[in-house]
């Protein structure tokens, strides 16, 4: 197993993508701290991890707040005594609320946009801040954040979300430069359109259209994101840092060229 004796924090660890990451890291021997706002889902994930033969701790926190991120780290250290891996999965968008291409620039309300920015950019930054001193003291660690192809090629009617995910890439590169001397590697994964239960439920009629724009002709599976994360937190990627791994089936390649 690739992660024996490692301790991993997975924020959003009870969500669709986070669940697959949590289970895969557990199968590879990691002890898991599942940090999520959903207490009931957290408890279910603890049971799933135990069924896989590993240990787990559920921490109900909202990492948008720095004190909650610090609480998460303190709980992990109290239980396991070390943190080797941080995977920032918590994030997402409530879906586009603008009806035309220019509505974003005309509207005055700020609440929703600020919420998306805080959830998708400030929260991962808070978690990295909360854990970095411990990793520096141990002179080792791996941080992986989930970004999005929206941060690479943009997303129509998703200005705030795209900006936040692009910010994750910038955060990753900068933190990788600053933390390298302490043996800490920092990378991110940018999924394309992931076929979660929520996507199939909310937009079933759009899936054929999306698949036409993806070179491999299908949506991404959550397990494929988990596999990329496992690679980046394991010793198999020991010489990789500051990178954005795009897992999109060719979505970012765009339309056919000449």
PLM region descriptions:
Residues 128, 164, 172:
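Active-site helix of classical SDR
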Residues 3-33, 175:
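Canonical Rossmann dinucleotide-binding motif of NAD(H)/NADP(H)-dependent dehydrogenases/reductases
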Residues 133, 177-181, 238:
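Alpha-helical segment proximal to the catalytic Tyr-Lys
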Residues 153, 230, 241-258:
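Short C-terminal tail/terminal secondary-structure segment
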Residues 96-114, 199, 210:
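Substrate-binding pocket helix/loop in short-chain dehydrogenase/reductase
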Residues 214-225, 236:
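A conserved structural motif in NAD(P)-dependent oxidoreductases
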Residues 148:
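Residue(s) in the substrate-gating loop at a strand-loop-helix junction
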């Amino acid at each position: 197993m690739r992660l024996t004796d490692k301790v991993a924090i997975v924020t959003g660890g009870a969500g669709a993508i986070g669940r697959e990451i949590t289970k895969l890291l557990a199968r590879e021997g990691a002890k898991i701290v599942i940090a999520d706002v959903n207490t009931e889902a957290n408890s279910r994930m603890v049971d799933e991890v135990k069924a896989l033969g590993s240990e787990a701790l559920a921490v109900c926190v909202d990492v948008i707040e720095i004190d909650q991120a610090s609480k998460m780290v303190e709980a992990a250290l109290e239980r396991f005594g070390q943190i080797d891996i941080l995977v920032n999965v918590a994030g997402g968008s409530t879906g586009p609320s603008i009806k035309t291409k220019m509505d974003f620039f005309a509207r005055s309300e700020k609440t929703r946009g600020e919420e998306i920015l805080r959830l998708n950019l400030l929260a991962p930054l808070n978690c990295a801040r909360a854990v970095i001193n411990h990793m520096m003291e141990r002179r080792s660690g791996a941080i992986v954040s989930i970004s999005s192809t929206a941060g690479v090629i943009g997303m129509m009617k998703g200005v705030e979300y795209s900006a936040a995910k692009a910010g994750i890439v910038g955060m990753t590169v900068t933190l990788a430069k600053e933390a390298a001397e302490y043996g800490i590697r920092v990378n991110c994964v940018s999924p394309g359109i992931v076929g979660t239960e929520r996507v199939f439920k909310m937009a079933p009629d759009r899936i054929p259209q999306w698949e036409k724009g993806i070179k491999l002709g299908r949506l991404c599976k959550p397990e494929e994101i988990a596999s990329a994360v496992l690679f980046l937190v394991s010793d198999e990627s020991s010489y990789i840092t500051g990178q954005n791994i795009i897992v999109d089936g060719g979505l970012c390649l765009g339309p056919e060229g000449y």
